[in-house]
Amino acid sequence: MSSKPDILTIDPLVPVMKERLEKSFTLHPYTSLENLKNIAPAIRGITTGGGSGVPSEIMDALPNLEVISVNGVGTDRINLDEARRRNIGVAITQNTLTDDVADMAVALMMAVMRSIVTNDAFVRAGKWPSATAPLGRSLTRKKVGIAGFGHIGQAIAKRVSAFGMEVAYFNSHARPESTCHFEPDLKALATWCDVLILAVSGGPRSANMIDRDTLDALGKDGFLVNIARGTVVDEAALLSALQEKRIAGAGLDVFQNEPNINPAFLSLPNTVLQAHQASATVETRTTMANLVVDNLIAYFTDKTLLTPVI
């Protein structure tokens, strides 16, 4: 019988993570609740992604679960109250993906405002010799509203300021260390800005916070960028606003029903779409994978976590 702790792996493992985990743990890929019954008492740890989390039925099925190591920074799909009640440690890959996610927010903003994807398609379709390429919008002197002003939101502010853009932010509380204007009313922020960038945490508190009223406040010349969670946006309201051109466009990295997104998005020329790729660089994903493993090793060595939430 192996002396290695048994770990349930909910998401597929990248090679560097799998190789390192196999040296210290016995791995059990999750397939179904039915199959989990056979190994449930042995499972002491879980690896998962921020998008997958740990469904309650899985947590409930594991009587000896001690630790969850998340490959990401989102915990909205983990019942943290239940984890606290059961004294289950939870760790995330804190401070590993801030720069790449902020870069993606700026890339989406530029792509949709400057019509980069539309112009790429225009050239590839051979239209350049006989037609006029569509115009984009300037970034300089535009106003950017950032909803959510944690590490990622502040990194976005630093980047867009370099373009000569004015920044204000909405957050649960003011950040006195920032020189940007704090706007406690989200609709007022949407009314003020030309670009609204979403960097809030997921979960019930932020669910559908971007609704029809907020989008109408953003207006026909406004752009929406979402690198937060798909649940933050009322997608029916967003699709309606895009189809009716009540907002100018949207750059979206996240959706409500990933990866099976609403097909209505696919035919909209005023959108730029990504497959939840904001942190998807070789460098960052390698750093994240190593931290997931390091947290598990630290826990099973001396019951500590390097980047704990709980």
UniProtKB/Swiss-Prot annotation:
Catalytic residue positions: R229, E258, H276
GO process annotations (BP): D-gluconate metabolic process
Domain of life where this protein originates: Bacteria
Record has Disulfide bond as a keyword: no
Reaction(s) this enzyme catalyzes, per UniProt: D-gluconate + NADP(+) = 2-dehydro-D-gluconate + NADPH + H(+)
InterPro entries attached to this UniProt entry: D-isomer_2-hydroxyacid_DH, D-isomer_2_OHA_DH_cat_dom, D-isomer_DH_NAD-bd, NAD(P)-bd_dom_sf
Keyword Transcription in annotation: no
Gene3D superfamilies per record: NAD(P)-binding Rossmann-like Domain
A Gene Ontology term for the protein's cellular component: cytosol
MF annotations from Gene Ontology: gluconate 2-dehydrogenase activity; glyoxylate reductase (NADPH) activity; hydroxypyruvate reductase [NAD(P)H] activity; NAD binding
EC number: 1.1.1.215
Keywords recorded for this protein, A-Z: Gluconate utilization, NAD, NADP, Oxidoreductase
Residue sites binding NADP(+) per the record: H151, I152, I227, A228, R229
PANTHER family with a match to the protein in the record: 2-HYDROXYACID DEHYDROGENASE YGL185C-RELATED, 2-HYDROXYACID DEHYDROGENASE-RELATED
Protein task: Catalyzes the reduction of 2-keto-D-gluconate to gluconate. Can also catalyze the reduction of 2-keto-L-gulonate. Can use both NADH and NADPH efficiently, with a slight preference for NADPH.
Similarity section: Belongs to the D-isomer specific 2-hydroxyacid dehydrogenase family.
Assembly, per entry: Homohexamer.
Name of the protein: 2-ketogluconate reductase
Record organism: Gluconobacter oxydans (strain 621H) (Gluconobacter suboxydans)
